[in-house]
Amino acid sequence: MKRSIRLLCFLYVLCCTVFVVAQPYAIQHLGVENGLSNNFVLSMAQDKRGCIWVATEVGLNRFDGNGFTVYKQHNSEIAGDALNTLLYDEKEDVLWMGGKFGGLCAWEGKSGCFRTYQARNGMKLENIVHLAKANDGGIWITPHHYDPIYFDSRSHRFTSLSDMGIQLDCRSNLCAFADGDLLYVGHYRGGMSIIDLKKKTTRRMLHDPSVPQSLPGHSVYSLYKDRLGHLWVGTEWGLGLLDSSTGRFTVFRHVPGRISSLVADRVYDICETADGKLWIACDVGGISILDLSQITFKHPEEVCFENLLSAVTGKGLSSSNIRKVLQDSYGNIWIGNYSCGLDFISHRPPVFQICGDRPVYGMYRGEEGQLWVGGENELLLYKNDSLAKRFDICCDMLCSYGWVAAIIDDGQGFLLLGLSDNGILRTELRTGKTERVPMGIRDVRVMTFFRDTDEKIWIGTVLGLYSYTKGIVRKETELNSKLEEKSVYGILRDRQGKLWVGTYGWGLKVFDDNNRVVAELNPDTGFPDGTVNSLFEDSQGGVWIATRAGLGYVPDTRYPERYSFYGYDHGLEDVFIRAVQEDVNGEIWISTNNGISHWDKKEQKFDNYDYRDGIPMGNFIEGSACRGVDGTLYFGSLKGICHFNPQELDTSYRVTPVQIMECRAMDGRTGKGDRLILPEENGNIELPYDRNSFRITFSVPDYAQNKRIEYAYKIEGLEDNWVNIGEESQMVLRNIPPGTYIFRVKARLRNGDWDESHVAAVPFCIHPPLWRTWYAYTFYGLLLLCGLYFWMCTYKRKLAARIALAAEEKRIRDEQELNNERLRFYTNVTHELRTPLTLILGPLEDLTGH
């Protein structure tokens, strides 16, 4: 009873919802042209790394914020290409998937590998159409033609309903939802079954055309329980809200001709977003959004939905065949289409908006928020950023083609339109009637207007200066005689009363009240550029000079020669300055060829914005800029009006932490499918010396930031400096020498600071070849020691032998010398003895002879 009362109260407020047409969503499309394997999307899931997984009829896709990685049977171990459903288990980091194949397939996040589980004992596990979480952490598997099966993800055991003692009357299933002891099963052409797993009872709910509060249709495609505890049921004939105590449904259907009713009756998916809104995916219709927080009572049929339609029937979705809606952890909305891929809605609407898609030249802010815009052969009036009126000025032009280069209010109820090669037209604001203003020359090109303090309007043309007073145009002959270059692009009067005139090729001249030249800024006087595109006076009285070589600034107009000049060195990505404008906080914004830039006074540098921030890619126009009453800035370009409110730019917006997505070896043997490198148990990547080239992919998974991200990396152990690689989200490391390194990468939003607190890192080691390993060097050392030992031993033996030989030789020499000495002694003794004997024998012989 209490549950019924709560439901009635809920319906009381729900049915009183006031339909409000919200601002259109900025929707981006992703399809096969972006790398998606197939445009027929059936299911989506997000893993804890922030990656979006997309199941299609041909392949599984992982989107990492930059691009898709496709998994098919030919390049992975996935069980099949034709997928139906996905379910991610964050605790175990496993993505479960079912499809038109046998078994339950899983992708394991820790290993990056696929694994397929098959049922035993004849249990049928084919064509799985839905996977749902069980209350105990298991999974309820819904095959299309067989009873739901419970899968214990820890023990990997399958249990059928018949094993539990439960029988179902209908075996053609579409979805299931577990709520405590109850299991809700949606059937195809068979209504819905409510199974009490504890009591082992089954209750069948069918569509009865004679009972308005019965199940809305015969086939139940989706089941969802919101945060308030209400069960929503999507069928082929509408959306039902179940009162479980009575078994009755409150039914919501499409009412032809009523734009705030459910967009279509066939409901394939229901998703509740963080802001308490139900996003209802309808086939052949689009998406209906129901805000449950803003409600009063009338009648259930008067409940109002906000509807998103396809691009064919309105503005928005790329297809009306919606199968799945997912809100990721960042708050973005992902929409799966059955024919056109994915639609993406960012959680942060773009600050920079574009009105129209045709060239915009002159621009002027009128009264009551009016914005007058000059186009090609036309004058446009915008109110609240929407086109309110269009004036065709072809009949009053002197030639068949021209554009409105400048616009100004003459203060007499007319708008002056300065045309290209067509002089000046005057449009009456009250009637819209247009007439030509005589200038004394037929086809002069008007470039700019400036209203002086005395209501005199100065006119800059390619033939010099003119002035407009009370409907009469006069050529300023005296001033023109002092202009070397007659093409006047900028005019203003400073606070001292001096007239500043910027020309196309001769820089800037400053005149006093007596039309005397008091200052000149041109290349001859040292000014960097002589081509002035426009002039602007800020709220402090300073003058900004837009040139083709940068931005000049004269802070004190009493001293025109004292100026600063800003270019590439100050952070500008493009120095061709088109127009200058100031916001309500006194900040300076400029348009260039490539985009829009903001001058940061504190940092003395420019912040740059371009097409990646939503700015048109076409060139901006000289002097085409103005500020709205609410502070919105408008810049004219060749691709429409770019407008934004600088106060909506959140400079505190932080970049999502960068993630290392994968590493792949570049061994050249597998072509595009390079081998996936899996980290070891210690988290390190280990590679041999002959596979020392590999690719590291990293990304910021939040796609809302994708186009605004810049990366920097360094490799500790190889280099110590951070290298800014811009938008590049992968690094190819080639021929890394053996060693231990750490690859680090950090990210930032463009114009922001680096996120030093979330630096992603992956350690890797390049193992040396066998002959360069430590044990090889140990062996080399031992071998060297052994060689040294043997050498020393040999040397010692040689030295000993040499010493012994020397000793022997010395002994022999000594003996020889001793013998020689003895011989000499004996010889000497003999000689000494012989001499006296000879002396004795001689006389004796003489005596004997005689």
Model-derived features: positions:
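Juxtamembrane interface at the cytosolic side of transmembrane helices
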Residues: Y789-L805
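Primarily the dimerization/phosphotransfer
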Residues: A804-G849
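Carboxylate-rich, polar loop motifs that coordinate divalent cations or form catalytic acidic clusters
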Residues: M1-P768, R772-C793, T838-E845
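Histidine kinase transmitter module recognition
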Residues: I52, L231, E817-L818, H850
